[in-house]
């Protein structure tokens, strides 16, 4: 059986993003900056501290990178940070990625600080889907978690995103015991009449948040059981869902997604690769230090070498992370490679 053509060509097995465990990777998470203007207590409680002097990937380097991934079968790109909207050329980056043959969906994750005034422009540039980090629906708790007293402004941005016409608007909320766990009913009531997918994400341990993790980690399993006991039904997973478990209710316009990295077989459905803002390929959020791609990003003439390096790197991808053993790999914090 022949494989689906890409740009009129046929992909052979050696040119596909498939690892040794038959997982297929059609989703690229691309960080364009590790700078963030929030001080979230689970990620950058002391604010952004630059740890390198490297320049972030240029728009041309990004274009060359995504072109290579697209020719290897990638169909979706999520632009991440840090806070990606801090880059002045963010709309141009969206447009550049959206026009690459083979890329079917362009998404981003943002803290929403300037979303209310930019949502329409990003949509017009070619952005299809947007995730907004809203870690509490209580303004005071939001301020406590993020270090920013702009809850209403962020929520205005969420509304602006819906009005702009995005195919999908998602809300990300990191679950934290003793901080925002009391907000769960507020969240669920809120999406009753909102066409939004609410995503509860388990707090994950990184190199620098061990004490915070031990104090505030909360398993998503109890939320899952609560949902099932209250009329919610788990959707059959689609390939683009990745490890997320999605739930729907006939009386609710919105959906709920659970991302539980400590659950059994979480990595079995992994469908994504990550590239950092300085051009390092990361096979896992909690994996190794990464494979440098930048020396091959300066010119499109190196595209075949770039594709080969990416494919070869996949051979070393492990079957799973080792978070349950307290090993967070080389990830200092979630902003470092885009979460």
UniProtKB/Swiss-Prot annotation:
Protein name: GTP 3',8-cyclase
EC number of the protein: 4.1.99.22
Similarity remark: Belongs to the radical SAM superfamily. MoaA family.
Cofactor requirement: [4Fe-4S] cluster
Residues in Radical SAM core domain copies: 20-241
Superkingdom of the organism of origin: Bacteria
Functional summary from the UniProt entry: Catalyzes the cyclization of GTP to (8S)-3',8-cyclo-7,8-dihydroguanosine 5'-triphosphate.
PROSITE patterns per record: RADICAL_SAM (PS51918)
Amino-acid positions noted as binding GTP in the UniProt annotation, renumbered to this chain: 29, 78, 109, 170, 272-274
Ranges in a coiled coil: none
Stored CDD domains: Radical_SAM (cd01335), Twitch_MoaA (cd21117)
Annotated cofactor note: Binds 2 [4Fe-4S] clusters. Binds 1 [4Fe-4S] cluster coordinated with 3 cysteines and an exchangeable S-adenosyl-L-methionine and 1 [4Fe-4S] cluster coordinated with 3 cysteines and the GTP-derived substrate.
Binding positions ([4Fe-4S] cluster 2): 267, 270, 284
A GO BP entry: Mo-molybdopterin cofactor biosynthetic process
Catalytically driven reaction(s): GTP + AH2 + S-adenosyl-L-methionine = (8S)-3',8-cyclo-7,8-dihydroguanosine 5'-triphosphate + 5'-deoxyadenosine + L-methionine + A + H(+)
GO molecular function: 4 iron, 4 sulfur cluster binding; cyclic pyranopterin monophosphate synthase activity; GTP 3',8'-cyclase activity; GTP binding; metal ion binding; S-adenosyl-L-methionine binding
SMART domains: Elp3
């Amino acid at each position: 059986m022949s494989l689906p053509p890409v740009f009129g060509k046929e992909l052979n097995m050696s040119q596909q993003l498939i690892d040794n465990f038959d997982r297929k990777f059609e989703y690229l998470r691309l960080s364009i900056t590790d700078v963030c203007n929030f001080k979230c207590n689970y990620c950058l409680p002391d604010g952004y501290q630059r740890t390198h002097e490297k320049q972030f990937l240029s728009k041309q380097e990004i274009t060359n990178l995504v072109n290579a991934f697209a020719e290897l079968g990638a169909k979706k790109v999520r632009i991440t940070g840090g806070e990606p909207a801090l880059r002045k050329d963010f709309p141009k980056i969206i447009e550049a990625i959206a026009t690459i043959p083979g890329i079917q969906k362009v998404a981003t994750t943002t803290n929403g600080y300037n979303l209310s005034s930019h949502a329409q422009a990003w949509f017009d540039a070619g952005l299809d889907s947007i995730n907004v980090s809203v870690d509490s629906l209580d303004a005071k708790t939001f301020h406590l978690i993020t270090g920013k007293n702009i809850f209403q402004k962020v929520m205005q941005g969420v509304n602006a995103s819906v009005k702009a016409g995005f195919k999908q608007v998602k809300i990300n909320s990191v679950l934290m015991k003793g901080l925002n766990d009391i907000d769960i009913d507020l969240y669920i009531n809120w999406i009753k009449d909102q066409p939004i997918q609410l995503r509860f994400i388990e707090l994950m341990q990184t190199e620098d948040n061990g004490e915070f993790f031990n104090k505030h980690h909360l398993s998503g399993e109890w939320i899952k059981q609560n949902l099932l006991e209250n009329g919610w039904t788990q959707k059959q997973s689609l390939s683009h869902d990745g490890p997320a478990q999605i739930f729907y209710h006939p009386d609710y316009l919105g959906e709920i997604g659970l991302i539980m990295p400590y659950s059994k077989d979480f990595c079995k459905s992994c469908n994504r690769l990550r590239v950092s803002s300085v051009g390092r390929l990361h096979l896992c959020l909690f994996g190794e230090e990464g494979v440098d791609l930048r020396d091959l990003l300066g010119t499109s003439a190196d595209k075949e070498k770039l594709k080969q390096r990416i494919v070869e790197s996949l051979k070393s991808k492990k079957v799973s992370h080792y978070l349950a053993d307290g090993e967070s790999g080389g990830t200092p914090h979630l902003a470092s490679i885009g979460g």
